[in-house]
Amino acid sequence: MLVDIVPIGDLPAQVKREASAALRGVYECDVTVHEEQSIPDGAFDHSRSQYRAEQFIELASRIGSGEKNIGITAEDLYYRRRNYVFGLAYLNGNGSVISTYRLQTSSDGGLKSKSPDAVFADRIRKEVVHEIGHTFGLEHCDNSKCVMSFSPTVREVDVKEENLCGSCNRLLY
């Protein structure tokens, strides 16, 4: 299985490294990093000052060379009526996206004594694993520690672990 990371807009090398390592570690897949892509034309919603997540997924699906593809951007994304999303994927699809925009808050809610850079890296890793999980057909999990649990805020992202719980792992394998 090949997962292609598609950087959309300017993205630090650290973000690409963390995403790649997490995907290889959890899914035991091959990972490539595509050349950087421009932000999709027409993706910006001026009334919200945010970008439409679906257009980033479409770009990752079209440009990516993997069986699964994940766009990663530093831009602020939204989907339908949600104020924002950390990421988005379609169940069993081949494209997905995460945004680092709202993952960069410095606090981890006092859960761990990690540096802001380490907290940010953990969040990137969890969100790419989560969104690629959806492309493999995994839905949201009720186990708050599972990487597939729904995370409306960074607090929930910080609570969950980077790995699939036993139930989700059995569904996948």
UniProtKB/Swiss-Prot annotation:
UniProt KW Metal-binding keyword: yes
UniProt xrefs under Pfam families: Peptidase_M54
UniProt keyword terms in alphabetical order: Hydrolase, Metal-binding, Metalloprotease, Protease, Zinc
Domain of life assignment: Archaea
GO biological process: proteolysis
Keyword Zinc (UniProt): yes
Residues annotated to bind Zn(2+) 2: 141, 146, 165, 168
Cofactor note: Binds 2 Zn(2+) ions per subunit. One is catalytic, whereas the other seems to have a structural role.
Active-site residues from the entry: 131 (proton acceptor)
GO molecular function annotation: metallopeptidase activity; zinc ion binding
Residues annotated as binding Zn(2+) 1: 130, 134, 140
Cofactor(s) recorded in Swiss-Prot or TrEMBL: Zn(2+)
EC numbers for this chain: 3.4.-.-
Biological role: Probable zinc metalloprotease whose natural substrate is unknown.
Record text on subunit structure and interactions: Monomer.
Stored HAMAP family: Archaemetzincin
PANTHER family membership: ARCHAEMETZINCIN (PTHR15910), ARCHAEMETZINCIN-2 (PTHR15910:SF1)
Family listed: Belongs to the peptidase M54 family.
UniProt protein name: Archaemetzincin
Species of the source: Haloquadratum walsbyi (strain DSM 16790 / HBSQ001)
Gene: amzA
